[in-house]
Design a protein with these regions (language model features):
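Short, Asp-centered acidic motifs that coordinate Mg2+ and/or phosphate
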Residues: 32, 52, 67-68, 118, ...
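Hydrophobic C-terminal alpha-helix "anchor/cap" residues
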Residues: 22-23, 60, 138
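Short, conserved SAM-binding/catalytic segment
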Residues: 43-50, 111-115
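Beta-loop-alpha module in the N-terminal Rossmann-like domain of NAD(P)-dependent dehydrogenases
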Residues: 52-111
């Protein structure tokens, strides 16, 4: 298996939850960081022992040092960044949402089909205790097939509607 050489863009609080997970995965051999705020990128490099800092997204996706990108920016940038990374030949992992415009979603799908690159939208809400509780509960109710429409919790402790 080819090792992942991953560049993280958007070094904010949410990204901080993912860098250590990727960093410690045996399939990952190289971690770079990128943020529009230089100080934040430098802090991430030091804190997570990143191999390199890129100061612009364009510089990062143009680099041969990485083969994949993890997008943790503002959600209105997810689609355009994923498209640019895929066009640059990079695999993409993105925080939700995939994009805000249907056209961007369709373009991501088109590029993935054409290139064979991997795109993964990192939906993590399905692992919340409240979501797990609802799925388990649905399996025990009258042996019927149930579909969860909404699961809302506060601090992942109380289930209000399932």
């Amino acid at each position: 298996m080819k090792k992942l050489r991953i560049g993280f863009v958007g070094c904010g609080q949410f990204c901080a939850n993912f860098v250590p997970i990727f960093r410690n995965h045996p399939a990952v051999e190289y971690v770079a960081v990128c943020d529009k705020f230089r100080e934040r990128a430098e802090k991430f490099k030091e804190e997570y022992n990143a191999d390199k800092i890129f100061y612009t997204f364009d510089e990062m996706i143009a680099s041969d040092e990485i083969n994949s990108v993890a997008i943790f920016t503002q959600r209105d940038l997810h689609g355009v960044m994923a498209i640019a990374a895929l066009k640059a030949g990079k695999h993409v992992y993105s925080a939700v949402p995939m994009a805000l415009k249907v056209e961007e979603i369709l373009e991501i799908v088109r590029i993935v089909k054409k290139t064979g690159l991997t795109y993964s939208m990192g939906e993590t809400g399905v692992y919340r205790p409240s979501s797990i509780f609802c799925r388990k509960k649905m399996l025990t109710v009258n042996s019927k097939i149930w579909f969860m429409e909404l699961c809302f919790s506060q601090l992942a402790t109380e289930v209000f509607y399932c």
